[in-house]
């Protein structure tokens, strides 16, 4: 069975985009892959504005959300990134074989560097962790020698660098790493902001009215969906070019009902946007209410911490063996 790995940062609240773009897919994939899911707490340090307020609680809630969504701890290994000390060790090894040019070419680094603030000495405050983020991500993947990595389009370039680094290591020190393949779901891989369908729905959005959080109440969900940007065509049709707002709402609808875009179009061909939005709001609200109840169960269950400890032990054993092999091939061991 091939191995799949992915992580999510424990910052603020998870969104419906996080669920539909990642968590839901993990649930579907765990029957076909050996799945490793981690809370990427080390990546949370990247912006250099780390807020540790209730951080341990937030991390725990991420695991509870995975379980509530249907992740089976017997099939999937759930752990905290910071508990696996082999990861930062491998990250340093990979960093030493990565050029500055490779890191500065990363699109995310370029985009976020533009927003950097000027300091008193006229230099820009660009955290070094932002530059080295891709090598830590590569270590996350290669520490477990994963075959498959589900990533959004915004992370695809980082995975390509991971493959490059793995191949470079193999050629220099001998066959050690697999070259991980990208997995991008056809539907729901990227849920967009309700108010601006040109940007991804994000928990760090400046306007939270365009973001549905997993802990939103029914009233808030209805307000956000009713206020979602559409167009003046008043026709429920999937067209990313002419109707990006409606297409985004249809993607959410399709992911939660398993209906195709064509089936949704036929269902609402005689209906206006008001009816469509009301139905979608009910679907989202009903789904999140059930999910919230399951999350609450896990947060209050002593089984949660026992499960995390057991999964962490398993992850550490695998990571240690893999990185020890790396050290051996480099003759550092």
UniProtKB/Swiss-Prot annotation:
Give the subcellular location.
Cytoplasm
Motif stretch ('KMSKS' region): 200-204
Q: Where is this motif: 'HIGH' region?
A: 10-18
EC category:
ligase
Q: What is its EC number?
A: 6.1.1.2
The UniProt keywords, alphabetically, are:
Aminoacyl-tRNA synthetase, ATP-binding, Cytoplasm, Ligase, Nucleotide-binding, Protein biosynthesis
User: Which Pfam family would be a valid example here?
Assistant: tRNA-synt_1b
Q: What's an example GO cellular component term for this entry?
A: cytosol
Which Gene3D superfamilies does this UniProt record tie to the protein?
A: HUPs (3.40.50.620), Tyrosyl-Transfer RNA Synthetase (1.10.240.10)
- What are the binding positions for L-tryptophan in this chain? 140
GO BP annotation list: tryptophanyl-tRNA aminoacylation
User: Which Gene Ontology molecular-function terms are recorded?
Assistant: ATP binding; tryptophan-tRNA ligase activity
Q: Could you say which residues bind ATP here?
A: 9-11, 17-18, 152-154, 191, 200-204
**UniProt catalytic activity:** tRNA(Trp) + L-tryptophan + ATP = L-tryptophyl-tRNA(Trp) + AMP + diphosphate + H(+)
Q: What protein family is recorded?
A: Belongs to the class-I aminoacyl-tRNA synthetase family.
User: Quaternary structure per UniProt?
Assistant: Homodimer.
Role played = Catalyzes the attachment of tryptophan to tRNA(Trp).
The name this protein carries in UniProt is Tryptophan--tRNA ligase
Species name for this entry? Answer: Ureaplasma parvum serovar 3 (strain ATCC 700970)
The top of its lineage is: Bacteria, Bacillati, Mycoplasmatota, Mycoplasmoidales, Mycoplasmoidaceae
Name of the gene: trpS
């Amino acid at each position: 069975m091939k191995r799949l790995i992915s992580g999510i940062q424990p910052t603020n609240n998870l969104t419906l985009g996080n669920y539909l773009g990642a968590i839901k897919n993990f649930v579907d994939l765990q029957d076909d892959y050996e799945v490793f899911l981690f809370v990427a707490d080390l990546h949370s340090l990247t912006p250099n504005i780390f807020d540790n307020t209730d951080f341990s609680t937030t991390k725990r809630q991420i695991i509870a959300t995975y379980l509530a969504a249907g992740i089976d701890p017997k099939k999937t290994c759930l752990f905290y990134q910071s508990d696996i000390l082999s990861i930062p060790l491998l990250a340093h090894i990979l960093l030493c074989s990565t050029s500055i040019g490779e890191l500065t070419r990363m699109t995310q680094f370029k985009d976020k560097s533009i927003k950097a603030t000027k300091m008193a000495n006229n230099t820009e405050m660009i955290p070094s962790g932002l530059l080295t983020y891709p090598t830590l991500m590569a270590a996350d993947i290669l520490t477990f020698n994963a075959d498959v990595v589900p990533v959004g389009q915004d992370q695809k370039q980082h995975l390509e660098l991971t493959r490059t680094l793995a191949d470079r290591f193999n050629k220099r020190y001998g066959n050690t790493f697999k070259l991980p393949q990208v997995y991008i779901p056809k539907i729901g891989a990227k849920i967009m902001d309700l108010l601006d369908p040109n940007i991804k729905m994000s928990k760090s959005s400046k306007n939270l009215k365009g973001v549905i959080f997993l802990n939103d109440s029914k009233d808030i969900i209805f307000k956000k969906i009713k206020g979602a940007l559409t167009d003046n065509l008043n026709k429920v049709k999937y067209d990313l070019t002419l109707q990006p707002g409606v297409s985004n709402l249809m993607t959410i609808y399709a992911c939660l009902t398993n209906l195709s875009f064509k089936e949704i179009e036929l269902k609402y061909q005689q209906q206006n946007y008001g009816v469509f939005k009301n139905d979608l709001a009910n679907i989202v609200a009903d789904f999140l209410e059930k999910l919230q109840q399951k999350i609450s169960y896990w947060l209050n269950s002593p089984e949660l911490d026992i499960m995390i400890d057991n999964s962490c032990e398993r992850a550490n054993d695998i990571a240690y063996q893999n990185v020890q092999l790396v050290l051996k091939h480099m003759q550092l061991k």
